[in-house]
């Protein structure tokens, strides 16, 4: 019989790592909620049309990377490759903009059929924030500050904020024709993929990871030279606000966003510690998306953080595992019933309790208590049952006379006091 394994690019999150994820998620939620941002949860499966309309037919995501299939009703469905389009759809479908501007956060798995590599699997996880109905430069700066403060509060080092402006759709239309004319002079350097992008989405070539193309685009025309005065003024205002907030940044005129719905502000937070996959957080403004998906005109801006890349950067700085406060050692029919009752009572008092269910000798159960890193072991056996007692042992204390305590089973207040010390 064939051994069943995960699909390539789909990775199990094991208990030895899940506690780190929980701590990151908890800190993210704290940062978002103190900024008045509320959670939204959307399905991982959507109609394919949502992404083809929202992200753009000409993008690599839609053209090459989506997990799409026809369901039994004949509908084309797709596992979400990103979160923004789904959140925008939910905002439209549920009429949330009728209640005023929306400040929302989301998290969960996304799916793209890419070559798996460190920090990016085919199933990957993002946590992100979206503002709908907010158009000011101040809202751009506020969103950037929320992302920046969250990542710095995690203790990450060597972070750099890069910003750019993509201007208006008219700015990009003028620039697009200039860029195409320039790139058409170098067909032998572009390769098949970039030649295809040249026809569909030439700005994506600026984001190429190919070293030869990166050298080529160093001399390409700049979008910043094709902006109208209003776009220039807006970008200068953003820089002034970021300086006021004392958030360090650099302008990267080659920075583009990979999806079609972006305009004006684009930003990335990168770390040299990640090598080629340097981006930890990416975001920008997308004022036309809601209308493009059938909703009212609604300015919007958002960002997403890649959890896998974030955990690579954090390394071992967050504890990997949650250790029990109490390991309940028990043997014998009456003792097992008493141990289960005590475990429940202690858990209801917010102690982390692991109950041994092996029926093994006490020595083996003590080894297990030590292995899981328990602070205390509580022993209930026939002797303790007959005396109406429980025996407590503080683990990892060398002096045996100081690490064992006998306590009456009925003395719950004293037990709690001891466990809290």
From Swiss-Prot:
Enzyme class, UniProt record, top EC level: ligase
Catalytic activity: tRNA(His) + L-histidine + ATP = L-histidyl-tRNA(His) + AMP + diphosphate + H(+)
Main location: cytoplasm
GO molecular function, one term: ATP binding
InterPro entries xref list: aa-tRNA-synth_II, aa-tRNA-synth_II/BPL/LPL, Anticodon-bd, Anticodon-bd_dom_sf, His-tRNA-ligase, HisRS-like_core, HisRS/HisZ
The protein's Enzyme Commission number: 6.1.1.21
GO cellular component: cytoplasm
Subcellular location: Cytoplasm
Entry's Gene Ontology BP terms: histidyl-tRNA aminoacylation
UniProt entry keywords in alphabetical sequence: Aminoacyl-tRNA synthetase, ATP-binding, Cytoplasm, Ligase, Nucleotide-binding, Protein biosynthesis
Gene3D superfamilies for this protein: Anticodon-binding domain, Bira Bifunctional Protein, Domain 2
SUBUNIT field: Homodimer.
Family named by the database record: Belongs to the class-II aminoacyl-tRNA synthetase family.
PANTHER family the UniProt entry points to: HISTIDINE--TRNA LIGASE, MITOCHONDRIAL-RELATED, HISTIDYL-TRNA SYNTHETASE
Name by which UniProt lists this protein: Histidine--tRNA ligase
Species this chain originates from: Prochlorococcus marinus (strain SARG / CCMP1375 / SS120)
């Amino acid at each position: 019989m064939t051994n069943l394994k995960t699909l390539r690019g789909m990775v199990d999150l094991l208990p030895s790592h899940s506690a780190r994820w929980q701590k990151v998620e908890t800190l993210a939620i704290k940062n978002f909620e103190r900024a008045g941002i509320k959670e939204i949860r959307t399905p991982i499966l959507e109609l394919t049309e949502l992404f083809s309309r929202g992200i753009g037919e000409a993008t690599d995501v839609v053209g090459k990377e989506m997990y799409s299939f026809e369901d039994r009703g004949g509908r084309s469905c797709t596992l979400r490759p990103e979160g923004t389009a789904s959140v925008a759809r939910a905002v439209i479908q549920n009429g949330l903009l009728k209640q005023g501007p929306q400040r929302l956060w989301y998290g969960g798995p996304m799916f793209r059929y890419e070559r798996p590599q460190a920090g990016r699997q085919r199933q990957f996880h993002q946590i992100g924030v979206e503002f709908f109905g907010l158009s000011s430069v101040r809202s751009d700066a506020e969103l950037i500050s929320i992302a920046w403060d969250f990542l710095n509060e995690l203790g990450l080092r060597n972070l750099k904020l890069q910003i750019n402006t993509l201007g208006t759709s008219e700015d990009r239309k003028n620039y697009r024709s200039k860029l195409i004319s320039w790139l058409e002079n170098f067909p032998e350097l572009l390769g098949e993929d970039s030649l295809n992008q040249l026809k569909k989405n030439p700005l994506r070539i600026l984001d190429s990871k190919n070293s030869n193309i990166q050298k080529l685009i160093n001399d390409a025309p700049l979008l910043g030279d094709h902006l109208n005065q209003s776009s220039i003024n807006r970008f200068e205002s953003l820089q002034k606000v970021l300086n006021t907030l004392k958030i360090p940044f650099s302008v990267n005129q080659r920075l583009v966003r990979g999806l079609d719905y972006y305009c004006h502000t684009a930003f990335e937070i990168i770390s040299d510690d990640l090598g080629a996959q340097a981006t930890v957080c990416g975001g920008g403004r997308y004022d036309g998306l809601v209308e493009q998906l059938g909703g009212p005109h609604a300015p919007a801006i958002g960002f997403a953080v890649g959890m896998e890349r974030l955990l690579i950067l954090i390394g071992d700085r967050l504890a990997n595992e949650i250790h029990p406060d109490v390991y309940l050692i028990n043997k014998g029919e009456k003792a097992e019933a008493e141990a289960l009752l005590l475990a429940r009572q202690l858990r209801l008092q917010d102690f982390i309790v692991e109950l041994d269910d092996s029926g093994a000798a006490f020595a083996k159960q003590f080894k297990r208590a030590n292995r899981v890193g328990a602070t205390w072991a509580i022993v209930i056996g026939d002797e303790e049952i007959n005396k109406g007692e429980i025996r407590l042992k503080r683990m990892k204390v060398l002096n045996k006379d100081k690490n064992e305590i006998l306590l009456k089973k009925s003395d719950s207040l004293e037990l709690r006091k001891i466990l809290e010390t």
